[in-house]
C-alpha cells in the first residue's frame, strides 16, 4: 500500500481504554466527530500490557522483553529516533508536565516516564543532544509559531489528560483544545496526525482493541481502514512514508492504506 511522503507526522497517545469505551460514547464527542470527518482505524490493537511495552513497540517495533513499567531499564537497540536522524529528519517529544528538557526521573506530578519511550533508549538517554529533544508540552505552541515543527512529533498528554487517571470527557476536551487546532495548522497541510491508545483493558490482540484515528489534509474524508493492524503497523506506515529502515516487527506489518488522498 502506498503511503504519502508526509511533510510532518504527529503521534498522540492516550491511555487505557478499549475502542468500545470511546466509539459512540457521548463523553467523547471530539474523538467521534474526528473519526467521521477523517479516518478511523477500526481494527487497531495494542500489543501488550502494561503501558511501557506498547510505547516501545510504537517507536522501535519491539517490546524488548519488557513486561513492566520500569523506569530504570535501558534498551540498547535502535529506535525511530535513530532512523529519522540518519535520514536527515528531525524529531521531538512534547511531554505534558515534564519539568524541563533533560529530565530523566521516573515521575513528576502528572508526568510519567513510562509514557515517554525514547528516554529508554541508550542512544538518547546517554546523550545530552538526545535528551534535549524531549521537551515540555508548552514548547509546541512556540515551535508552531516559529514554523519549527519537527518532521516527527510524539505528543504525550499528562496522566489526567491522557485518561489514565481522569474520565474520558477530560481527554476529549484536551483533544479538542490542543490537537484539533494542530490538525488545522498550516504546518500540517502535507502532514498527518495519528491519535491512538497505548493499550486497552482486554488481552485481545495482545493489549486490547483500541481506538485509532488518522487526521489531517492528507486523509480522505470519511474513510476507514478495516484491516487488522497494531502499533507495529503504525510504525511501518511512518517508515514507508519516508523510506526508513524497518525496525523489529514493523518489517512483518502491513502499512495503513486506503485512507490517503491522491
Regions flagged by a language model, labelled:
Residues 1-262:
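N-terminal pro-sequences and low-complexity stem/linker regions of secreted or lumenal proteins
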